[in-house]
Amino acid sequence: MRNSFIRNGFIAAGAVNILAVLVLSRAFTNRVIPETDPEVMSNFGLLMIAVWGLAFLAVANRYRSVKWLVGAFVVEKLIYATVWFRWLTTHDLAAVYAKDLFAGVFYSAYGLNDFSFFLFFAAVFYQLHQAEKVPNNHAINR
């Protein structure tokens, strides 16, 4: 993957985390999201999702020097995607939509988003790992 694509991927991951939380939670005033899954999506949990977004933005131009942080991003996204899948298979999404459209959209999309960025971060981590195997080689195209 080219450097510009990867940089833009980190920016997109950060922007989606921050903007989706702020918009769909209506700046943390939407009670349906935290009531629907208080263990994971409390207002504090939503705030932490935005903080992860800040971390993604912070490394967009420096990801090559923080391979293991990218690895942590892989784990974070895998956990959220797995939790979402478990939630989706044990809850009634239509009932969430009936209570609040924004909450329904949030619970419909967050796991797909996290799984997509899990794949992206995993590919970046793999590319960084491969680049370390070849001395004096920059496997990531500029």
Residue spans for each PLM region:
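Short, charged juxtamembrane terminal tails flanking transmembrane helices
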Residues: 1, 129-142
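Cytosolic juxtamembrane helix and N-cap/initiation of the first transmembrane helix
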Residues: 1-17
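Short juxtamembrane and helix-loop transition motifs at transmembrane-helix boundaries
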Residues: 2-7, 28-38
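Core segments of alpha-helical transmembrane spans in multipass integral membrane proteins
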Residues: 15-19, 39-61, 75-82, 112
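Juxtamembrane "helix-exit" motif on the non-cytosolic side of transmembrane helices
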Residues: 23-33, 60-61, 86-93
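Non-cytosolic membrane-interface motifs at loop->transmembrane helix junctions
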Residues: 32-42, 67-73, 96-110
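Mid-chain, well-packed structural core segment of small domains
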Residues: 64-93
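Membrane-water interface at the C-terminal end of transmembrane alpha helices
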Residues: 109-135
